[in-house]
Every structure is written in structure tokens, then in C-alpha cells.
Amino acid sequence: MGAYKYMQELWRKKQSNVMRFLLRVRCWQYRQLSSLHRAPRPTRPDKARRLGYKAKQGYVIYRIRVRRGGRKRPVPKGATYGKPVHHGVNQIKFARSLQSVAEERAGRHCGGLRVLNSYWVGEDSTYKFFEVILIDTFHKAIRRNPDTQWITKAVHKHREMRGLTSAGKKSRGLGKGHKFHLTIGGSRRAAWKRRNTLQLHRYR
């Protein structure tokens, strides 16, 4: 096995004494830093490389801190108006994962970069920490490489805002296999609409 395989196995055993100590110390370190800061290198090089990261010019890593828990509806003094069934304020569950929220915040902060992917690096009782891989699409090393030219196209601007990253697609229910049958036809709404529309074709 190569070195990255050993690292992967280490990260799979998060309850081991070594990893518990490491994650605890790192969470303390991350809490002292700002909620969005640039990391000099990936904390998990094996995971970052599997997601497309290369240790060369044009690739940037940002570490994001996201507060855990549900989403409180932003209404003044809980005044939601309307019928009591829609009066919920506190027990609201956000439709997207905290990982996709972290990607969105990184994309907003670094508007000139493109979000490639992200991965989990730690959590405590209050926060979750993710590292986001961003790409500078105007760097010659990116534009001249056939493997990364696809992300330089304008259609990939702010892909994290439109649910086109891996974490975003998971929240949209998109994927392959029997687990994703609710989105056959493009999206949950398209699948529901097709299954709930009566079509009476003309007999010819």
C-alpha cells in the first residue's frame, strides 16, 4: 500500500486514540481562527487528491467553520403571519447540508475562484469544519491543462450556488442507483410532476 492508502485508513478509524487526540487539538486550533481562512495546504492530502486537488499553482484551499444545528426562520419576534400550520420558527430543517453551505460561503468570499469540491476535517459540539478546494481559472497552469480546462468555461461560474458540486447534488437527491429514484427526470419536482400528471394520449 502507498502512503495515501495508510492515511485513508487512519481517517477511517476516527475513534482511535491517535485520531481522537488529533481531531480534538485541531478543532481547538480551528476555533481560534476566523470562520473563513486560507489554509497553507490540505489537512487531508489523500482526500483532497481524490477530489481533484493537485499541489501546483492555481489550486487554493480555504477552511470554513459552519455552525451546527437546524435553521431558525429569520422573522422578527417570530411573526410569520398566515395560518398556524406555517407558524414554525425554531424546528425548521434546512434543505441543504452544512457542507454545501460551507462551499457557498467560500464561493461568495472568493468570487474570482471556482469551487471544485470540499471535504470534512472536523467537528465539535458547536461547529463543523470543512476544507474547500478552489481553482484560479485565469492561471496558465489551469488553462493549459486539458484535465482542468472544463472548469474555466463560463458555465461553471458559481457552481456551488446552483447545486452543481458533489455536496450540492447530494442535497438535490441526484445520483445513480436505486437510492435516487425520486429524481428520475432531472429533479424531485420534475419526477413528482410527471408521476402526478394524467396523460390521455389520442387513439389513432
From Swiss-Prot:
Main localization (coarse): cytoplasm
Keyword Ion transport: no
Keyword Ribonucleoprotein (UniProt): yes
Top-level taxonomic group: Eukaryota
A Pfam match: Ribosomal_L15e
Keywords: Cytoplasm, Ribonucleoprotein, Ribosomal protein
SMART domains: Ribosomal_L15e
UniProt xrefs under PROSITE patterns: RIBOSOMAL_L15E (PS01194)
Cited InterPro entries: Rbsml_eL15_core_dom_sf, Ribosomal_eL15, Ribosomal_eL15_CS, Ribosomal_uL23/eL15/eS24_sf
GO CC annotation, single: cytosolic large ribosomal subunit
GO molecular function: RNA binding; structural constituent of ribosome
Disulfide bridge positions per record: none
GO BP terms in the entry: cytoplasmic translation
Compartment list: Cytoplasm
Function: Component of the large ribosomal subunit. The ribosome is a large ribonucleoprotein complex responsible for the synthesis of proteins in the cell.
Known partners and oligomeric status: Component of the large ribosomal subunit.
Family membership noted in the UniProt record: Belongs to the eukaryotic ribosomal protein eL15 family.
Protein name: Large ribosomal subunit protein eL15
Organism: Hypophthalmichthys nobilis
Organism phylogeny: Eukaryota, Metazoa, Chordata, Craniata, Vertebrata
Gene from which the chain derives: rpl15
